[in-house]
Amino acid sequence: MINLRKTHPLMKIINHSFIDLPAPSNISAWWNFGSLLGICLVIQILTGLFLAMHYTSDTLTAFSSVAHICRDVNYGWLIRNLHANGTSMFFMCLFLHVGRGIYYGSYLYKETWNIGVILLLTVMATAFVGYVLPWGQMSFWGATVITNLLSAIPYIGTTLAEWIWGGFAVDKATLTRFFAFHFILPFIIMALVIVHLLFLHETGSNNPSGINPDSDKIPFHPYYTIKDALGLMFLLLILLSLAFFSPDSLGDPDNFSPANPLNTPPHIKPEWYFLFAYAILRSIPNKLGGVLALLASILILLIIPFLHTANQRSMMFRPISQTLFWILTANLITLTWIGGQPVEQPFIIIGQLASILYFTLILILLPLAGLFENYMLEPQR
């Protein structure tokens, strides 16, 4: 009998992508996060679908519809907690996935990397519009502050902001369209994920050593399906622990109050996964300058492949670059902390120094370290 998975047109695609896929024999647990992101996306789409069945995107009823989901819908509290905390898990996996790509030189697969950066931006946009939907205080003021940044664009800024709002301020029209965006974007993300995998399977996976692994490949199944299953169990353990025992620990207490345009919260701040970019935005006193720095903090990922100066692909055998990478990691954690602090000294100066260091590390120090390591590895006369 002919093996169906190798002959059936649909099964053949799945077989070449997840079963008989030749994978490097030495990829570590850092390569688990791609599959975990796929699982996170599926969890978010499924829980989101059930939430959308009971949610109403109207300024008068949005907040109470979320309360209704938690109180009256069967397991509504669980669906909502999984969806809210699933976002945090999604971003945790995203940051680790991007960090892995930078550390091991995966960005040299330029098409895969660029689609990945577009995916990151799309996920950030989806999370932002989703945060507005419960229509709590922080939802409303977060939407107001972030959409207001568009007005910093010269000449067309104010018109653009009002066009996004559908009026002269964040109101019913804004909430309705944000719900529409939040519903459609995950499906666009799914399409982009397929393109991301398509480009990845053109070249094959990178590996920790950064050298060509063609001479030593093993089938994806059962070796890496088992390994991914272990990662999935850890992910679900953390997500379910959060959802059951501490569902509100990552949220903002202000969001338990319904949106009130007449009362501004003392500290307007986004969810934790945006705080590093928010800190960079706030570190520049000029509005337009802040917006440009905010965009640059993410879009800088697109030029990382062109800043690679080292003869070796991975940082595995490059101690100076390794040190700078971990300084960059610590710097991003510092920025995340600063983004959640009030705008006063010493937080202002720490944020400004951390923002300067962020761009200096990526644009200047890491490329220089690559060149220096090349020089050190050359045979000395």
From Swiss-Prot:
Presence of the UniProt keyword S-adenosyl-L-methionine in the record: no
> A cellular component term (GO) from this record?
mitochondrial inner membrane
Tell me the membrane topology, using the record's own terms. Answer: Multi-pass membrane protein
Family matches, as PROSITE patterns: CYTB_CTER, CYTB_NTER
Q: Where does heme b b566 bind?
A: H97, H196
Protein name as catalogued: Cytochrome b
Q: Which Gene3D superfamilies match?
A: Cytochrome Bc1 Complex, Chain C
| Comment on bound cofactor | Binds 2 heme b groups non-covalently.
